[in-house]
């Protein structure tokens, strides 16, 4: 019995239970799954006028039509069960394109069809898996070794792919468990701002019915990461409590020497044919240089290093910073503290999403494990809703006149919508509205989800301070206008060293060339964000210019990068080469295009200073590409762009 037949059997075992689940599930993915199974477009054509967008809250299917969709889905599944049929052929490219456009209210071009076929695993059970083109028994894989630095999403993805290919590897992780940033961040309210059914690997598990919320909290994400590592038996391939300090290339042996401090503080080394860094960008906290911070006598800690031994209940708490971490932590602790004083340098644009706090319905969870193609179409919708459906609106319109507040007509309309939300939430409080309104276009900085931030600001025990901080004394914070704010606890929600890629890791390539000398303090560049000339057999996940500043899922980026890296390693091994190294001209040409494209994006606006930029104002973290463009660039490894020795 195939996996498809097992799902059909599970779905139809109790037709009444199936009907109940359909009645309480997200209906458009159900409808798309029905079309996929039946090739009957009539209901989708009828429903199209009621679909205003990819988000479920932009869909208003009438009850009578919904009932017919549910009944038709039950009937088609029962027919499959009665005849014991296997999965139908994948719809044609034209049919898929039609389904996609009707399911999200248009905008999907034919270029997206191969991308979504891979992302939804319609072409193959695991669309991004890389397989050998030669008999692996002839390749002497046992003598190869890969070191992966980092045990978060990137490291786990690389390890799974290497394991599938039979290439020996070792993961070196500085923490004492898998999880990366999701292990380190545990502040109150910590969670994703990407829908969970997108914030997971496309290949595992299939489907994934486990999420309880549409935007899950930290513990659920961490459990997913660690259970994935367990499912692929990665614990035995990993050393924890390891701080990698140096990675040095030896030209004579064409191997990398990886030096690290172990859990006992002793220095060790390990040799590797290839190195993959998966250290992330948001994992090295920034401690602000505020006069007197070191003299403060109360608890003071970064949000990414939350001290759970400190009880904030009934205390006077200060949060310095108003980024994503503060946006989640502040509303979570505000009801229980004596007072909460928020020190804001610049206000953020905050978008309301009606699904943000909603649970995944029981019907949706039930169907994810039983209705064929339901999870695939749900993933498609979320990918379109969070990213590709609006990426084009983040490019500057050269004919747009008022670029101080917006960069094009769509951006201006979004600004008006966000301002309406601010005014409604702050109930006409003009002082707060002025303080909370950014002076730059939407998406100039990372767009945040409203976690009750504005409602928090309306609480009588919460104050928003927009003056700068002059100094911190033993028991208080002093603002630049001289006002004293006594506080019992200080939370530093002050971000990370996002522009200092790989810091503080020392990487030395050919002729002892230091990567830190090539990049300087914070001017990282890499081909595809993955690899750099003079550093053969060295690859990065989540490298320079790969942060998704507009939305989507970083896991999508990671999967694209890892698939590309696996192809590079495969090419090197199959050609019996020792090294693979990107040509300098290819690297340089790509980065010129990166800079040109970034200059057209909203986050390069003159009024914006964000963590994507380095100290000179160059964007080093954010990707200017749509997901489609990046997927096209990383889909196939081009040997002619590389030198092999």
Across the structure, where does each feature detected by a protein language model lie?
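Catalytic cores of eukaryotic secretory-pathway lumenal/extracellular enzymes that build
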Residues: 183-232, 245-261, 277-310, 355, ...
């Amino acid at each position: 019995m195939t996996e498809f037949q097992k799902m059909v059997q599970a779905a139809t075992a109790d037709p009444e239970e199936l009907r109940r689940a359909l009645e309480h599930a997200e209906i458009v993915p159900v409808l798309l799954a029905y079309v996929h199974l039946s090739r009957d477009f009539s209901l989708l054509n009828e429903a199209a006028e009621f679909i205003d967008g990819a988000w479920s809250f932009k869909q208003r299917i009438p009850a009578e039509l919904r009932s017919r969709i549910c009944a038709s889905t039950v009937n088609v599944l029962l027919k499959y069960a009665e005849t014991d049929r296997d999965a139908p052929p994948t719809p044609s490219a034209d049919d898929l394109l039609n389904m996609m456009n009707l399911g999200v209210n248009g905008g999907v071009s034919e270029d997206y069809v191969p991308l979504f076929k891979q992302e939804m695993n319609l072409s193959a059970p695991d669309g991004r898996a890389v397989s050998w083109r030669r008999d692996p028994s002839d390749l002497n894989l046992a003598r190869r070794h890969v070191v992966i630095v980092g045990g978060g999403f990137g490291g786990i993805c690389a390890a799974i792919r290497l394991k599938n290919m039979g290439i020996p590897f070792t993961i070196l992780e500085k923490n004492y468990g898998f999880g990366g940033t999701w292990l380190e961040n545990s502040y109150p309210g910590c969670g994703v701002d990407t829908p969970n059914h997108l914030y997971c690997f496309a290949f595992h598990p299939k489907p994934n019915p486990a999420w309880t919320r549409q935007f899950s909290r930290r513990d659920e994400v961490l459990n997913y990461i660690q259970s994935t590592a367990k499912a692929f038996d990665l614990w035995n391939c990993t050393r924890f409590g390891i701080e990698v300090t140096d990675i040095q290339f030896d030209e004579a042996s064409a191997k990398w020497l990886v030096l690290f401090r172990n859990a006992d503080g002793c220095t060790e080394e390990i040799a590797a044919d290839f190195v993959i860094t998966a250290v992330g960008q948001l994992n090295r906290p920034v401690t602000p240089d505020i006069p007197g911070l070191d003299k403060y006598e109360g608890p003071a800690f970064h949000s990414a290093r939350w001290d759970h031994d400190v009880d904030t209940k009934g205390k006077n708490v200060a949060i310095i910073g108003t980024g994503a971490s503060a946006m989640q932590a502040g509303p979570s602790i505000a009801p229980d503290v004596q007072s909460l004083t928020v020190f804001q340098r610049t206000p953020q644009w905050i978008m309301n999403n009606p699904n943000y706090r909603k649970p995944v319905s029981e019907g949706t969870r039930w169907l994810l494990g039983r209705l064929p193609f339901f999870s695939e179409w749900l993933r498609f919708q979320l990918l379109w809703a969070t990213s590709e459906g609006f990426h084009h609106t983040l490019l500057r319109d050269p004919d747009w006149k008022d670029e101080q507040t917006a960069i094009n007509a769509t951006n201006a309309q979004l600004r008006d919508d966000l301002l309406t939300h601010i005014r409604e939430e702050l109930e006409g409080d003009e002082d707060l509205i002025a303080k909370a309104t950014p002076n730059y276009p939407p998406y100039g900085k990372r767009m945040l989800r409203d976690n009750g931030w504005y409602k928090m600001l309306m609480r009588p025990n919460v104050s928003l301070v927009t003056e700068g901080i002059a100094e911190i004394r033993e028991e208080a914070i002093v603002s630049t206008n001289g006002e004293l704010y006594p506080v019992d606890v200080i939370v530093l929600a002050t971000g990370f060293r996002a522009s200092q890629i790989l810091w503080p890791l020392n990487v030395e390539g050919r002729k002892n060339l230091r990567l830190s000398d090539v990049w300087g303090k914070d001017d990282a560049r890499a081909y595809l964000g993955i690899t750099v000339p003079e550093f053969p057999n060295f690859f990065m996940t989540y490298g320079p210019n790969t942060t998704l500043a507009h939305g989507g899922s970083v896991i999508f980026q990671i999967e694209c990068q890892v698939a590309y890296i696996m192809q590079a390693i495969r090419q090197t091994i199959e050609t019996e080469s020792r090294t693979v190294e990107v040509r300098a001209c290819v690297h340089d040409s790509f980065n010129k295009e990166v800079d040109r494209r970034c200059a057209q994006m909203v986050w390069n606006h003159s009024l914006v200073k964000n963590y994507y930029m380095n100290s000179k104002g160059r964007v080093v973290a954010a990707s200017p590409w749509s997901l489609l463009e990046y997927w096209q660039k990383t889909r196939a490894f081009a040997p002619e762009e590389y030198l092999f020795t």
